[in-house]
Regions:
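Short, acidic loop-to-helix structural element flanking the phosphoryl-transfer center
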Residues: 43-75, 81, 85-89, 112, ...
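Short glycine/serine/threonine-biased micro-segments
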Residues: 12-14, 72, 131, 153
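N-terminal helical cap/lid subdomain that shapes the substrate entry/recognition surface
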Residues: 1-61, 68-69, 94
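Short "lid" loop at the C-terminus of a central beta-strand within the Rossmann-like core
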Residues: 14, 80-81
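Gly/Ser/Thr-rich helix-start
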Residues: 15-17, 59, 75, 102, ...
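Asp-based, Mg2+/Mn2+-dependent phosphohydrolase catalytic module
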Residues: 6-7, 32, 67, 81, ...
Length: 186
């Protein structure tokens, strides 16, 4: 398999693990080694999902602030569900009660299914919710769920890319996320 640059990998992520591997493996699913490679990747990721992983600066404090203000918070990701739950327990235990990742019985983002599942578990409606994300997939997911979306600028996509994909609200800092949520709520 070819080595991939960081920029290539950054462009591959966001649409789920299988599509990540389809993009990364030459000839995608047509490659006779694809399924074996995909299985190896999932096993490796399961053992190493926490390697070089940590919350972005200020995110834990943002979540704690939002919870103190009475907001409910959930994580919805296209990462493998067991990894999402493991990372949530490691970094956000006690402050994020719902964390949902990619699993076979529910469509992944940009379909709104995981968002609706999170809202159901939180006892909230889409009218009470704001989606916060860092990608075009997040913008599309929020649109499909009928929710406003705040696009953060510290993730894998820049402001120009997000604007090209329909972003309406931007946050450069976690403080701006909190301010925008209050503004959208008005």
């Amino acid at each position: 398999m070819p080595k991939r640059t960081l920029e290539e990998v950054r462009q591959f992520v966001g649409n789920g693990v299988r599509l990540l591997m389809i993009r990364a493996v030459p000839d995608g699913e047509s490659n006779p080694l694809f399924e074996e490679t995909f299985a190896l990747f999932k096993d490796y990721y399961g053992e190493h999902c926490n390697d070089n992983t940590k919350p972005y600066a200020g995110v834990v404090e943002l979540i704690e602030t939002l919870k103190k203000k009475g907001y409910a918070v959930a994580i919805v990701s296209n990462k493998i569900d067991f990894a999402v739950k493991e990372l949530n327990d490691l970094y956000f235990k006690g402050i994020v009660p719902v964390a949902i990742g990619e699993k076979e019985d529910i469509r992944r983002k940009p379909a709104p299914d995981t968002v609706f599942e999170a809202l159901k578990e939180l006892g909230k409606t889409k009218e009470e919710a704001v989606y916060v994300g860092d990608s075009d997939v997040d913008i599309e997911t929020a649109k499909n769920a009928g929710m406003p979306c705040i696009s953060v600028l510290w993730g894998f996509r820049d402001k120009e890319f997000l604007a090209e994909h329909g972003a309406e609200y931007y946050a450069e800092t976690t403080e701006e996320v909190s301010e925008l949520i209050a503004k959208i709520e008005e």
